[in-house]
Amino acid sequence: LNPATTTAAQVIDAEGQLLTPPFVDAHFHMDATLSYGLPRINQSGTLLEGIALWGELKPQLTQEELIERAMTYCDWAVGRGLLAIRSHVDVCDSRLLAVEALLEVKHRVAPYLDLQLVAFPQDGVLRSPGAFDNLQRALAMGVDVVGGIPHFERTMADGASSIRLLCELAAAQGKLVDMH
């Protein structure tokens, strides 16, 4: 636009400071945020050990602690310029405790943070008994996006089948898809 052809409602002199659009975190796992050392430290530093530790921690989680840690993270994120986050939330626990907690967080932060939730079958939608039903329940509760982890299925064929299954579900419900 030519500055001479538009009139600003307000002019702010940033005095040489940098002004940018807000940051976006397009891939996060807010249900696991601030859980370092729980139930213990990942000694190998590998993803597989991290996933195993998460599996050990899930039965011990409470909704209150999930909400508290997620709210702390959201406050930190906004303070550093993040105003949109897409977070995966594990749906392999039939209690859907993390889903309930992050839906509550989404409601609380809605006035200042765009939090989009992905129903994520951490242990594989085909590999983990009940995961597909849990994923559908999470979507019915208000989760925004269908997630998947095809490389974590038992075989490449199962991985391909999981992609088809999840994409068909997303298409039927008019949802986006975000797979690892």
Language-model features, listed with the residues they occupy:
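Histidine-rich, glycine-flanked metal-binding segment
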Residues: 1-20
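A cross-domain feature marking catalytic cores of carbohydrate-active enzymes
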Residues: 89, 117-122, 148-150, 179
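Active-site gating loops and adjacent loop-to-helix segments of metal-dependent hydrolytic enzymes
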Residues: 34-66, 142-145, 166-169, 173-175
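Short, acidic/polar
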Residues: 65-76, 126-138
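Divalent metal-binding segments
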Residues: 44-97, 151-157
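Histidine/acidic residue-rich metal-binding segments in metalloenzymes
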Residues: 97-111, 127-180
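Di-metal (Zn2+ and/or Mg2+/Mn2+) metal-binding site signature of metallo-dependent hydrolases
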Residues: 17-39
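Divalent metal-coordination and catalytic microenvironments
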Residues: 16, 27, 81, 146, ...
